[in-house]
Structure formats: C-alpha cells, structure tokens
Amino acid sequence: MVDLQLHQSLGHHNFTNKLTFYVNGVKRTISNPDPRGTLLDFIRTHEGLTGTKLGCSEGGCGACTVVVASWDREQGEIIYSAVNSCIVPLVAVEGKHLITVEGIGSSNNPHPAQERIALFHGSQCGFCTPGIVMSLYALLRNTGGQPSKEQIAESFDGNLCRCTGYKPIIDAANTFSCGRPGGCCRDNASGKANGAGATVGNGMANGAAAVANGNGAAANGCCKGNGAANGCCKSNGSAATTANGDDKEVDMNKLFTPNGLPLKPYSAKTELIFPPALKKYELNPLFFGNEQKVWFRPVTKLQLLQIKHAYPESKIVGGASEIQIEIKMKAANYNISVYANDIEELKTHKYIPGKGLEFGANISLSKLEEVCDKLVHELDPNVSQIYGAILEQLKYFAGRQIRNAATPAGNIATASPISDLNPVLVAAEAVLTVESIENGEEQISMTDFFVGYRKTKLPAHGVITKIFVPETVPRNEVVMAYKQAKRKDDDIAIVTACLRLALDDDFRISKARLAYGGVGPFTTAAKGTAEFLTGKLLRRETAKEVLEGAIDCLIKEFDLPYSVPGGMAAYRRTLIMSFFYKFYSTVLEKIGLAGEAQDNSALENTYDPQALLEVTRKHPVGSRDLTNPYEQRIVGKSDPHLSALKQVTGEAVYIDDIPPYHGECFGVQVMSTKPRARILSVDPSPALEVEGVVGYVDVNDLPSREANIWGPTPVGKEPFFADGEVYYVGQCIGVIIATDRMIAEEAARLVKVEYEELETVITIEEAIEAQSFFDYQPKAEKGDVDGAFAESAYTFEGTSRIGSQEHFYLETQGSLVVPEPEDGEMKVYSSSQNPTETQVFVAQATGVPSSRIVARVKRLGGGFGGKESRCCHLSSIAAVAAKKYKRPVRMILSRSEDMLTAGQRHPFVMKWKVGLDKNYKFTALEAKLYANAGWSMDLTKGVIERAVLHAENCYDFPNARIQGIPCRTSVASNTAFRGFGGPQGMFMAECYIYEIADQLGIEPDTLREINYLVPGVSSTPFKQAITEDFTVPDMVKQIKKQSNYDDLRRQVEEFNSKHKWIKRGLAHVPTMFGISFGATFLNQAGALVHIYHDGSILLTHGGTEMGQGLHTKMAMVCAEELKVPLSQVFISETSTNTVPNTSASAASASSDLNGMAVKHACDQLNERLAPYRERLGENATMEQLAHAAYFDRVNLSANGFYKTPDIGFVWGDPNPKPAFFYFTQGCAVAMVEVNTLTGDWSNLRTDIVMDIGRPINQAIDYGQIEGAFVQGQGLFTIEESLWLRNGALFTRGPGAYKIPGFRDIPQEFNVGHLRDRPFKHLKTIHRSKGIGEPPLFLGSSVFFAIRDALSYARRQNLGEATMPAGLVAPMTTERIRMLAGDSLYEHKGKIEPTEGDDKPFFVNA
C-alpha cells in the first residue's frame, strides 16, 4: 500500500494531479488518472481510439506507435516523436500533443501517407498498419515531407509486419522521397529501367508511364555535387527514368500507383496544427495515483532529488522500455514511479573543445544520436572517434520509437549485461555525475560503475544527472564499437564491444580499454588483456605475437562454460576474438603498419584489411511483372484490398476493438508452470479476494467430464481444462474472471497450484530415445524400394533438421463471447480462421446445440494457420465463463501467453536414404520424418501427412517409401502453419539434392535437371500422375534468364576470389505445392448472395479474411459474374448463421472453394435475371433489374455450393485417387553476402517466378508471394525458438524471438509469373491458382545461398570441397560463424562440454 499523503519535504512544490494535453487537436484535462495504465490503455479505453493496436506490450513490434508532438523551447521548433504507446506512461504526454492514426485522416479523406500505403497494397491483415503509418507520419512532419531513402529505412526499424514482406510499404514511402519516386539523388538512386511490362520498385507513374525505382549509382550524379542536369530534386523534382528509358520530370502533384490510380499530393500546410497554447504551457510538478501505485512528475532537478530523498525506493522512469517489460513479463511492482523526462536540466548537451562531450542523463537517445552525428561530421576524425562509436551503437539500438523515448541514464542504471551503449562508455572512461540531497554532487567513473548482475555503485538516494565523455586524442588512438545480434536492426546484442588503444609516437601501446557486453553478468573490461597489451611495441615483426597473446588473454578472461546462461558459448567466445581481430587490423591500418595478408590463416596475418569490411546493406529496390493478358472487366485487375483504407486509418475493427458490452468481464488463464506433473491441489481463494474479481472457472464448470475433451481431428483430442495432470508449461488449469484485464492478470498470479513433477521429454531426439510416439504414422510407398537400392550405382544417407517457427501474427488470439438471455444462445466474436469449429466446440463446452451459437469473424490480424484450431480453445473457455456468470467475457492473450500456449510450426528431424543409377538418375527414396507434435496431436495428422507427400518436392522417384512419425513431447501442441508440413518435407528434398551433388562433384542444378518429374510419364510417391500442370522446368528457364543466373554465378566466383571474410553465395530452389485439403471432406464451400432493391449486393461466403485478400477476390468474382461495378458488392463478415458447416480458411484453397461457390450462387441469380436483361437491355443497371424481378416475385437470394472434384486420396489404398486438385509451383534465385568473421549476412537479391495461373487479382497474389517468401526466409535463417531445460518456452516476445524486419528483405526483390501459358487445363475459378502457402518454401533459397557462401569459405580455410552434412535450419548468425572453418573458431573458439557440464543452456525442441 502507498501512503497518499505527500511527504512533508515536498509540500512546498505545489504538486497537482491534473494532466493537461491535446489528443488529435482537442484539449484534454484529466484528474488523477489510473496510475497502472500505459498511454495505450488511455488511448483505447478512455478515448475509444482503437486504431492504435496492442501487439506485444514490450515496444518490440510497433503496432502501438503514436506520435507525440512537443515544443522545443531551446530550438524554437516542434518535434514529432514516434513512440511505443504500449510502454510509455500516460504522464509522458502531459503538456504535449498526442496524435493517433485517427487524427491524421479517415477512409473518406486519408492522409497521403495512409492513402499511399493502401493503394500500394502495403496493408494486408492491417493490424500493424496504423503503427507503420504513424512512423512514416512522424518522419514526414520532421522532414517537411521530403525524407531521404535512408531516413525512410531507419524510420521503420521499430515496426514489424508479418504479411506483406515490407516491399510495398517501402515503395509507398519512397514516393515522398525528395520529390523523386526512385528516391533522392543524394541516396545514389538511379533511373535504371527494367524492361517492357515491368515496373521497378512496385512502380510509380507520371501519367501513364511507369517510373523506375532503380538501384546502383545515379546516372547524373547527385545534384549536391552539381552532377544532376536539372538541378536539385528538392526544388524541382529530380530527373527520373521511365520504363521506356526516357528522362522525365516528375511532378509530385501528379503521381500514380502502378495501375494508374492517382495519388494525393503531400502538403505540410494541410497538416494537423500544433496547439498554440502548448507553446506557452508551463509544466507543473505532478503527483497522482491510488493506494496501489503513485506517479511523480518533477519538472526541476531539485524536485527530482527531493523526491528520491523522500522515497529512496522509488523507481525513476525515462523511456520505460525496461521497466514496463518488467511489469508486464515479470509482474514487477513499482509502487512509486518518478517520470523524469520533462526535466530540461537533464536534457542539455554541450561540447567542450579539447575535453569532450557533456550531456544530460535524460537526453533522448535519438537526440544523443543527432548530437554525436554532428560532432562526427564537424570534428577531426581522430578526435571524434568515441562519438562515432556511440553513433555506431545507437544506429542499431532498439527501434526508432524506443530511441525517441529512452535515455542514457536509464540504459546505464538498468545495468543490462548486453547493453549496446555501456561498453562504449566504459571504454571511453566516461564519468557520471551523481547527485543526491545527502551527498550533493559526486563523480563515478564508468570503468568501475558495474559491480554485479544488475548491480551498480549508484547510491540508493542518488540520481545520475550528467554524463561526460572525453574526446580521443588527435594522434595514435583508435576506438571502434561492435555488435552482433540475430537480426541487424532492433535486436538485443549477443556480444557487444568497444575496443580502444592509445599508442605513443614509437607505436608502443600506452593504454588499452577493451570493454565487452554479453560475455558476463555485467559489462566488463578485459583488464588482464589490457595489461598484456600495455607497453607492447607494434612493429611488423611483433604484430603477430601481440595479436596471438591478446587473443589468448581474452579467452582466459572470458572463459565461458558450455552451459553458460544465454547459451551460444562457442559463438560468444569466437565473437570476442573476431571483434578484437577486426579492431587489431584497424589499429595497424591507422598507424601505418598496413601490409598485404600472407595467407588465409587468421593468426598468420599481422594486418588483414578485409577484416574491416562489412556486408552490403542497401535500400530495397525491385520489380513486379505487371503484364496480365487475362485481365477482364473486374477479375484480373490489381484493385487494392477492399479494407485497405479502413486499415490504414485505424477504422478497421478487430476483436479487441469492439466496444465493451454492459457488464463485460475479462478472463485470464491460470496456466501450468510445470511441463509434466500431477496436480495435487488448486486453490483460487487468494485470487477471489481481490477487489474486482468476479469468479473462477475450471473443468468443474463444464456440463460433463466428456465435454472437456475436444480436438480438430479424431486423433487430435485434448482437454479444455487440465484435469488431474498437466502436460506442458502454459496449459490452462482455470480462468480468472474480473472486471478488467489488469485485475484479472494480477489475480491469476495468486491462484495456488501444487504439483508432483513427472518425467519430461522436450526434443525429438529425446522422444526417439524414449520411443515417445503417437500411434498414427502415415506411410507413402511406391515400387520395389529394397530392390531398387540393391541395384543402385550410388547410395547416400543423411539427416536433415529444421526447427520450429512462431506464427507471430500481429493480433494475438482473442475472443469475445456474449450470452443471450434465452435458450443458451451466444454470439462468439473470434479471431478465427475456423468459425464452424469455433461454433462446434463452444456448443460442446456450454452444452447446447450448434444452432444456438453464432460465430462471427469480421477480420483477423493475421493467421498463418495459427488460428485454425487453437482459437477454438480460447473461445470455448471464455464461453464457459460467460455461461456461468451470465455476462459477456472477453479474452485477449498477451503476446507472451500467445507464444507460450498457441503452438508453432512443427520441428522435424528427417532421416533419408537416396539411390541413383550411374547416370545420376534417382532410383529410390526411403525416409523417416520425425515431427515434434507437442503434447497432443492437434493438427499434426495433417501436417505430417503433407510432409510425407512433399518429401520428393518436384523430383521423380520410381521407388519410394516415406513414413511420418509424430513425437509426443512435453511442449505445447504444435499446430498448423503456412505450408502445413510441406516446407519441412521439401527442405529435406533440397538437402539431399545439395548433399548428393556435393558428394558427386556436380552442380545441384545438374542433379535437378536429370531428375525433374516428367508430365505424362512420372507419378509421385503417393501415385498421383504428373500432368501438363507441371511447369517447374519452364519456370527455371524463365528465372535463370530473368535473373542472369550464369552471370550472377560468375560475379560470385569473382567476388569470392578477391574477398577473404565476406563471401557471396547463390542458390536456386524450386517448389511444387499441392492444393487441396488432405481431409477430402473439407474440400467444400458455400456462399450466400443477396441482391437488394437498390441494386446493392451482400455477399457472404465460408472463408475468413486474414489479410490474404480473400474477401476482395470473392467480391471481384461476384462483381464479374453479376456484371456490376465492384463497389456494389459488400462483404460484412463471415458468420455461421449465414453459411453453415464451413471449412477453415487454410490449405491455400479458400479462393478456389469459395470462389466457385460464389460463382454457383451468381449463376443462379443470372439465370433468374436473364429475362430482365433481355427485356431491359444489356446496359440495364442492377437496380433496374432487381426492381423488375422483385415485382415479379423472383427470388433475389441464392445459396452457392462447391466441392472439389476428382480427388479423394486414402492412405494405404493401392490405387488411390489424387491427393491434390493441382499444384502451385515456383522457383527462386537468391544471392547473399555473408561475413564469416561475425556471422552477419544480407540478402542482396532475390528473383521469384510463380505459376499463378490466371490471377483474380495479380497485386494481391504478388503480396502473398513477397510476404510468404520473407516469412520463409525467416523460417530458414533468423527465427529460432528456444526452450529452457525446465520446459518453458524462452522466446516469448519480439525481444527474444526475431522475425525479419524492414531491412532484412532482399535488397533487390524481383517477382514475376509464368508467362505464355493459356492454363486451359485448370478447372479452378477463372483458372486461377492458390498462392498463400506455396511461395513460403522459396525462402529456403536464402538458406542454400548462405550454404553456398560458406562452401567458398571452407574451401579457402580448410581445403574442403564439400559442406558438412546435416546442416540445421534456421541458419542463424551463430551457425554461420561456426561453419566458416577459419582458425579463430577451429583452433580457439570451440567449447566442449565437460563432465557435469554437458547440457547447453537452451534446448531446440
């Protein structure tokens, strides 16, 4: 409890509890607001502005981004700061102007940023979009609407999108770039055209001509260097080049999208004005709260010191980036918080010539970045080195939103062992000024500030007020900063360092400071190594000895055990050495001891100039092939997503945006903390005593024990509530129901559960050893496998491993259940891909027929398979609570809860054996595919079946035996994920292609070409005949020509021959994905079409909209068939009371199934309207036709239905029907660049060609291709799920789990489709093809390109002609570094387990 009586020492300061600020131009004065909430809570709950979304609660995804505008009195200007409202406290906007996405535009009058993202197809599910819009808005306001491309790129580094692949968002933003669609000429953009029929950079147009957004150097040079013939792009719109190659002046008032839609010009004059009253507003000290928590907001340093003196236990808050995470994730309780970011005295900065930089402890990191950048450009480079090091670290420090709010003092005082900034301050010998009422002002050196894990020398009453960073001396001093993470931008460090050496005029080392983070419990200086270096003379003849000695010292100082907390022991040790090796070469270069490297052994080289190089990172460019010979009146056009403008303006409604119902409660699960245990007792009584708690539900509140068992398949059963035992960390034991979310969360933690722990199995290897398998083990078999192996000229065996992948849909699982007063009826609003199963299981859990449950789905904020079955559980337990308490119940999972409980993509271990004849043609395949199913089967049956059915990819095996074996483990049930087992099976196929080609000494493409399936001849291992639908070889030819593949290979060879540490790799990968549900009965769909008097049309179908554009495509089909404009067709939602018994929106079949059902309904209506069309003429409007038909009593409503013909595969049938209606195929070429010294890498270029048939909407299909590819790239490279040894998932949020960001996409991204095909064989809706899942596997091309790059490194370093067998996906930076084969790792970096220390810290399930 907090004493609300203000401490007597503070009484004279006139504290107030009233907060005054503006929201979207409207003044707000709030008295004593709820102290528990964040700014986001206020925006959504108090203001009802639900456009700003909650995505993660830790400032890692950017969905909650808003803009805070403030008046900078010192500069006399308005600063627009994008911030994460999910972590920033409400007090942070006092005296400022808060701008949300609703404040800048509406769907009827969108802001140019909103409109361009919408019309460039930059919004799919839309949940992330408002945050992205606001990041761009802040940039436009701060740059006057003319940002550079580099500014655009860095402005998005705190935003994530899981759908689009980012490219269309970047292209939309590029239209603002200094008046030039290709970007500002100072960004070195060129006007390179991409040929007829293609637009580069998603295309911009001036009139009808598409303007290219090229790559490389500007044709006319930068206007700043007087190279541009037409003057500065900022003044007149720079010369750009059209697709026809003609220079053309770009009029920024006449911009168009690729398909000719005009764009609204940007004018700063029409922007929301900054409230004039705020320029004069005087901040007053604040004190508000309740008995649980209070906030102070001092406005002077003295007030802050006095508060800290009166309340030494108080927590000082700057950006709240660390504190809010501790509150949310660790249930930390900071009863007294002090917001210190409005104290101007703590935000000053001054450079003292000849001495250094002094800055206030609470200057924002963005401002510090700006200050250091200015010093780096203005001072002698030797003097400004330390500021360059700070700048280098800040560049990749979190995201822009965090840097706008976070402060140096917060970063220092938090004492994180992986801080990016602290090693620089330690190496710089920075001095902290610490003040307190007791001791006044004192100085503490950063060199000995940290004394333990999260412990410092900061006194209990002390406040850091200033930081002084000395400048480096003008001569013979070198400072460099380094950081390595899993993802380059917005990621926590694995190892970070700042290394500093000073030498005298004889090049004798006079001082050394080597500060490392990520290698111990706190930021540590390598004092022993510094002592070794001090006094050493650097000469050519001594340099090698000094290098070797220093590295040996570093290894001894940072002796990381195999089981070190945080894992990656060998990688971290190798990074320690790699950073020093890079630094040492920098030192030798700067003091003039540069000499050519003598050979390829790291420790043999005294000076290695190539160690200084970094991987190439450029602003993304690329092309989309926009030719479409099959475009019809509506179908085939690239219309934007129907909800795009609603999504970019925040008007689109998701589950948690539905206004609260009267009496609504919030539910939070009580989850198991053990992976496998008996429940001895559950005591909710402490929770029930909390004010605001309504009650508790568990298995005893179901109609029967039998009703507790549910599951999407007959073999995939599990309980709603744990009943006697728990099987994984996170399993639902019960649900606390309370009047609001925060109360429910607090109370759920108070429920007491006692366990008796049982034996656990976490990994596939452990399951194999324990024979822990589920009974269902599908097998596909064809031919005489054993006989074929006996006659094979070659036989190869191997094992392929691929890890799991988190869905990371931006909208977490959510449900709102509203009980009706009669007959047990309920309305269920769910973020579900599967409304029918939601209906079925809610009915089961509440004991009523399905007819009394209406499941409704407006849209999902992403699904990717993760909301196919797992959503049903959440809706059902919410329904149990709603029934018991007769009140609406809302349950929205936090990001941590969602990742802990909702399951992931299945990890696989796949053991294969392949036979070949003397001509290298495959003779036989035998494989066993082990999948980690988790604790229950869920949808594993279908996943492992599809993995088996895709284990040959597109290669011909006359004899095959492939078996799937699901492993029972003690982790959450793994579930459907885009590709549904297909990518794992095809990954195995490409692994054996590469490994066998290595062993045979031939190119993988040679092996592929020999073994492609042959139409009319071949059949798959599941005996489906290959028809003319097989197009992979044709696409391979097309993509190799399009990408200039042979020339790229020559470039790679040449580059690698000249570069030692940076290597390039090139790979080509095909894919062949079967389209149909594995369960034949699911291949059906229904639709309902109503035509009203006014000619408007209401369409409902069985599919759900999750960003894939299904509603848009279905509306286009309906409009095409009924011969009306697209604007006349409206889709409101998907609901079980309009179209019953639907299949989940999954398997890439939703357009096929629902499209045909829509067509069937429209055919009926057209037949009924035919007489009226004949009578009234072809030009009659639908309104006229509907009127005439109505008065003749003609039914203007039709129900359509469709079931996929000619399929019906049955496992074990010796002569089965086809498993798939057709295959969607494609191929990709990827070229990467890898830094083998650190593991860092970048995707230089990707080209994709897909067989998409005759697309219903080409732009939507391209969005699916790009988005799936980037998601697949994540699967095969940076996305790594890790478990602790106690069975708990460690990677439970964007801080620990990394998906690709804006700067991880290909730097040149070219997408096209199979050309010159009539597609007459297709029997699909308008001869289109399903596209949602098939492109995802193409992301593996990046994995194999990295493999290719590493093969060059190993050939150079070890003389090995082949790569090690059994490479593991994802190919993380750690795995890349460990595979390089250089002497630093091979001789010094390896860490072997010792007796009693044989288990790594993390587990890969």
Swiss-Prot record:
Q: What class of enzyme is it?
A: oxidoreductase
Subunit-level organization: Homodimer.
Record has Coiled coil as a keyword: no
PROSITE patterns assigned to the protein according to its UniProt record, in alphabetical order: 2FE2S_FER_1, 2FE2S_FER_2, FAD_PCMH
Annotated protein name in UniProt: Xanthine dehydrogenase
Q: How is it used?
A: This enzyme can be used as a potential additive in the production of low purine content food, which is recommended to people suffering from hyperuricemia that can at worst lead to gout. When used in conjunction with other enzymes of the purine degradation pathway, uric acid concentration is significantly reduced.
Which pathway features in its UniProt record? Purine metabolism
The processes (GO biological process) annotated in the record are: cellular response to ammonium ion; cellular response to cadmium ion; cellular response to copper ion; cellular response to iron ion; cellular response to nitrate; cellular response to zinc ion; guanine catabolic process; hypoxanthine catabolic process
Q: Which InterPro entries match?
A: 2Fe-2S-bd (IPR002888), 2Fe-2S-bd_dom_sf (IPR036884), 2Fe-2S_ferredoxin-like_sf (IPR036010), 2Fe-2S_ferredoxin-type (IPR001041), 2Fe2S_fd_BS (IPR006058), Ald_Oxase/Xan_DH_a/b (IPR000674), Ald_Oxase/Xan_DH_a/b_sf (IPR036856), Ald_Oxase/xanthine_DH-like (IPR016208)
Which gene holds the coding sequence for this protein?
A: AXOR
Can you tell me which residues form the catalytic site?
1333 (proton acceptor)
